Structure formats: structure tokens, C-alpha cells
Amino acid sequence: MESFKYCFDNDGKKWIIGNTLYSGNSILYKVRKNFTSSFYNYVMKIDHKSHKPLLSEIRFYISVLDPLTINNWTRERGIKYLAIPDLYGIGETDDYMFFIIKNLGRVFAPKDSESVFEACVTMINTLEFIHSQGFTHGKIEPMNILIRNKRISLIDYSRTNKLYKSGTHIDYNEDMITSGNINYMCVDNHLGATVSRRGDLEMLGYCMIEWFGGKLPWKNESSIKVIKQKKEYKQFIATFFEDCFPEGNEPLELVRYIELVYMLDYSQTPNYDRLRRLFIQD
């Protein structure tokens, strides 16, 4: 008879643990609910209790990504869904803590323009919601944007940032330790500033460029060269797109999106509707 490793979450639900999906700062395991099914439809993210990012992520799921709040927000705006995973379990042992979400599929790699436009709208909707709750995601990059059954999901809420202090938008200060993939990092983050709303949207823009078939010209460069190029390209957007799309096939919607995002001040509220309309197809 086959033996299984298993654990219980804080609600007493039993989870059967499968193979490792990823091992880094945290570990991801395939998990399933019962012994009769052979499909591992869920993912467990587990780490030592001393690892603060996972604790922050769990707290963010509980306090900010509340299903009732999300449902009310989307219903008021006539939005089908946000790219936010549902939380299925939280648990802890003496030394470790974990949470469980659905297996959300693979990294989004679009095969047609329609799926790109839909993903852009969904991601703008999702960031607008997160920002409306007083936070930024802080780590928008392709590895954190997944797709399964044509549904986009944004994962990894371990680097979220509070936008307000005592009701006032945080000041721009270059006093943070940077983290994340330098290719998609916003300029503010490169310089040590907390990611604000414009930073989330800037990082999404770099993802969009690749989704539309372009390339980021600073890939494979050192971190110093990457930030230098990004700062220069913000001043010369036409040159930026010439280098991203050498064949001259850059979508005008994407160019306008980047222009609008680059014009935002650090504490400015973006015009999400204007950004969204760029990618809504009739």
C-alpha cells in the first residue's frame, strides 16, 4: 500500500503532499485534498516562521484579499474576475508556516493578440483593486502571472507595500533594499524607493512588451547598466520602442500606455479607466 505525507491546516483539513514544484526562499509543493484523487490540484507554499515575507503574504491574503470585498468591488464595476487567487488553507507547525492555493497553471505566454489584450485589461483591473486597498504588489514580473483555463492569476504577495501613512501617501525616499528581477523592476525600486502605483504599472508595462512580441533591450546587462538604460529610455520613449520592436511593429496602444505611466508622479493616482480603455477591443 502506498504511503503518503500529509499535514493539517488550521481548520483541520487534511492535505496530501506531493512532489516539490519549486525550491528557493520558500518551497512549493503539489498537494491534494484526499486519498482517492490522483490529481494534485493545489499548491502549498511553506517556509520557516522566521522568514517574514511568507508571514506578510499570509497576512495580506487574510486582511486585504478578502473574497467578499473582491466580489463587491467587481460587481459594482461589472468586472468578471480579478487575477487574485483564492486561499484554501493556512497552517503551521512548531517551526514552519504554510498556505494553500489552487494550482494556477503555467506562466502566461500568449499565442495571439486577443489573449494579450484581455490579460492587459485583467491586470490593470487587478492592480486598481490592490491599490484601492492602500497597497502595491511590488513584484510584477512574468513568473508571477499565470494562466489556467484561459484565466489569468497574479501570485506572490510577499513584497507588498503600504501606500499611506496616517492617511497620507508615503514620501519618496531612496532608503529601501531592492529585491526582484532587475529586468522588470521599476526605476523607483532600482533606486531604493518603495514601489508606488506608478511602479506597479511600469513593471506591468515591461511584461506587456514581451507579451506583444517585443524584447527588453537591457536583458543580460549588469544591474548598473539596466537602471541606466531604463532612466534614459524614460526620456526617449520613441528610441525605447525602436529597440524593443526593431521591425517597427510596436502596438500603438502599448506605446500610449507606457507614455501615460511614465508621466505619473510618485504619489499620483493613475487614471485606470484611461489605461484600461487602450486595451478593450470592440
From Swiss-Prot:
Gene3D superfamilies linked to this entry: Transferase(Phosphotransferase) domain 1
UniProt superkingdom: Viruses
Activity regulation comment: Both catalytically active kinases B1/VPK1 and host VRK2 repress B12 inhibitory activity in a B1/VPK1 deletion mutant strain.
Domain Protein kinase: from-to ranges: 1-282
PROSITE patterns: PROTEIN_KINASE_DOM (PS50011)
Gene Ontology cellular component list: host cell nucleus
Cross-referenced SUPFAM superfamilies: Protein kinase-like (PK-like) (SSF56112)
Example of a GO MF term: ATP binding
Location(s) in or outside the cell: Host nucleus
KW Nucleotide-binding (keyword) present: yes
Keyword annotations from UniProtKB, A to Z: ATP-binding, Early protein, Host nucleus, Nucleotide-binding
Binding annotation for ATP: 1, 30
Chief site of localization: host cell
Presence of keyword ATP-binding: yes
Similarity field: Belongs to the protein kinase superfamily. Ser/Thr protein kinase family. Poxviruses subfamily.
Summary of the function given for this chain in its UniProt record: Pseudokinase that plays a role in viral DNA replication repression by activating the antiviral protein BANF1 and inhibiting the activity of host VRK1, a cellular modulator of BANF1.
Subunit and interaction comment: Interacts with B1/VPK1. Interacts with host VRK1. Interacts with host VRK2.
Protein name, UniProt field: Pseudokinase OPG198
Protein's organism: Monkeypox virus
Gene name linked to the record: OPG198
